[in-house]
């Protein structure tokens, strides 16, 4: 098959103008069980194509699915959430689509994502309720990395994540460009469930001195290795406190203007 690597593990259909007809061919492919990674990014994939993709049975060994930069909305997300193709996934890339609260709720309640370790929902308007749905889900027990940059979650969504009883295994959390202020930052700093984080990215938000101080004093981030918090509203004296804190001494990377 064209665009399949010699070992049969990667099928790259990114930006190949893949429409319903081409996806239908996948439905009839004899054996796709060796494919571990499927790239379908940048193909303007929408409703009809998602319906077809959800019926593909051959990708029994698929662990990574890339659907970023398409036209996937809430209804398409609902279809995907119940798709056979999801059952063994460890990585799902849905960045830069049009998935809102309902779509996030569908993914959060999917019976097929129990093995998922990495979820990319950056640049989708899931909002605070979408974040809450993910945070309250028992269906994502393996999740280790959650990418929610530019998802409009704000303080409310950040609080829901910080208070989640199900994110104890989370190691990487990305919340850039979400208009998060002190409330969200303080919630993260006081979280009882985010103690295994080793990467936290909260740059380009609206965190001020109180939020910055809470992060510096936090006992939550004992395992944190990398912290990205540039482009907030933290004044120089508090930035100095952060740089001199025990937290900063433990970090391998601190990015802060």
Where are the regions that the model predicts?
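LRR N-terminal entry segment and analogous cap-like coil->beta motifs
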Residues: 1-51, 63, 68-71
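A generic tandem-repeat structural signature
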Residues: 45, 51-126
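Eukaryotic tandem repeat interaction scaffolds
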Residues: 117-206, 211
């Amino acid at each position: 098959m064209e665009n399949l690597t010699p070992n049969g593990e990667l099928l790259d259909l990114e930006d190949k103008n893949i429409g319903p007809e081409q996806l239908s061919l996948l439905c009839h492919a004899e054996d796709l069980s060796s494919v571990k990674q499927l790239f379908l990014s940048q193909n303007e994939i929408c409703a009809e194509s998602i319906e077809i993709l959800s019926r593909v049975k051959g990708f029994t060994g698929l662990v990574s699915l890339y659907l970023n930069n398409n036209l996937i909305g809430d209804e398409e997300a609902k279809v995907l959430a119940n798709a056979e193709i999801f059952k063994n996934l460890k990585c799902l890339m849905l960045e830069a689509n049009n998935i809102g609260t309902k779509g996030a709720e569908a993914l959060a309640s999917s019976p097929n994502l129990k093995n998922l370790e990495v979820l990319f929902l950056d640049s989708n308007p899931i909002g605070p309720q979408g974040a809450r749905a993910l945070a309250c889900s028992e269906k994502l027990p393996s999740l280790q990395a959650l990418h929610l940059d530019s998802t409009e979650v704000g303080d409310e969504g950040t609080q829901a994540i910080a208070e989640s009883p199900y994110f104890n295994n989370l190691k990487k959390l990305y919340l850039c460009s979400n208009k998060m202020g002190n409330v969200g930052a303080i919630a993260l700093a006081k979280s009882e469930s985010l103690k295994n984080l080793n990467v936290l990215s909260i740059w380009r938000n609206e965190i001020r001195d109180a939020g910055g101080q809470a992060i510096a004093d936090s006992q939550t981030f004992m395992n944190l290795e990398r912290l990205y918090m540039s482009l907030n509203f933290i004044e120089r004296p508090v930035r100095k406190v952060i740089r001199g804190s025990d937290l900063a001494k433990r970090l391998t990377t601190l990015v802060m203007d």
